Amino acid sequence: MDWHFQGTNDDREHTKRIIIEYLNRIKAGDDSAREEFILRFRPFILKLVYKATDRHVEPENSEEYSVALLAFNEAINAYDEEKHSNFLVFSEQVINRRLIDYKRKNHKNKMVYPFSYFENEDIKLERTLSDADGNNAIERLEFTDEIRLFKSELASFDITFKDLLSCTPKHRDSRELLINIAKKIASNDGLYEKLKKTKKLPTLELLKLAKVSRRTIERNKKYIIAVSLILRSNLEIFKEYAAGIQEKEVDLR
């Protein structure tokens, strides 16, 4: 039975109940339930590894799969139904974070790029590839894949890199404010799923959570949406400055 399919509402509710039943058995100390649960979700874990690495892996010979498996176990142990309505969404977050951490540790001298770098992204992608050689070639290719993936995701919201260049706030305190708003979306499964489904910001909810004016949200909606997507993605190149801006001065323009 494929538990992570796109089915009807009744199918999804049934799947959710089964998952919760398994999680309750596992938390009660049923090791056999844990083993069966992990075995059934092995395709789900492998799919996330493939998305993160852009290649099929053999579980027995893949460090990335081992990292993802440990992360899935971590998600099982940490899952709280009151805080996260969907275990699959929660476990995907945990796995993606751990894979990103693993990748960072194994890729030194990772470069961080501002939005302005991608204003003419197709030209610069070509230049990036032509300059790549030796040990940097694979990393450069991964970099371009991340750009294309993010570009495609933005396009579904009718946002371009050029839009981001023009709408990124000039002042650091303004950027911090908007990133904090985006974090409220990214850390809330319900709000994030609503954003993805409607392609619009959950403005009413944000007015209550962020305590900012409607005008602030509406005027900066493209930037808030972009950062929300970054924070819930595998796009670690962009995450570097989306997260790091609050640690030191970083010009995102």
Curated annotation (Swiss-Prot):
One of its GO terms (cellular component) is cytoplasm. SUPFAM superfamilies: Sigma2 domain of RNA polymerase sigma factors. Keywords: Cytoplasm, DNA-binding, Sigma factor, Transcription, Transcription regulation. A motif (Polymerase core binding) lies at residues 63-76. The keyword Phosphoprotein does not apply. Induction: Autoregulated. Up-regulated in the presence of xylan. GO terms for biological process: DNA-templated transcription initiation. Its main location: cytoplasm. It is found in: Cytoplasm. One of its GO terms (molecular function) is sigma factor activity. Residues 203-222 bind DNA. InterPro entries: EF_Hand_1_Ca_BS, RNA_pol_sigma-I, RNA_pol_sigma_r2. Negatively regulated by the anti-sigma-I factor RsgI6. Binding of the polysaccharide substrate to RsgI6 may lead to the release and activation of SigI6. Belongs to the sigma-70 factor family. SigI subfamily. Sigma factors are initiation factors that promote the attachment of RNA polymerase to specific initiation sites and are then released. This sigma factor is involved in regulation of cellulosomal genes via an external polysaccharide-sensing mechanism. Recognizes the predicted promoters associated with sigI6 itself, xyn11B, xyn10D, xyn10Z, xyn10Y, cel9V, cseP, sigI1, cipA, and rsgI5. Interacts with RsgI6. This is RNA polymerase sigma factor SigI6. It comes from Acetivibrio thermocellus (strain ATCC 27405 / DSM 1237 / JCM 9322 / NBRC 103400 / NCIMB 10682 / NRRL B-4536 / VPI 7372). The lineage of its organism: Bacteria, Bacillati, Bacillota, Clostridia, Eubacteriales.
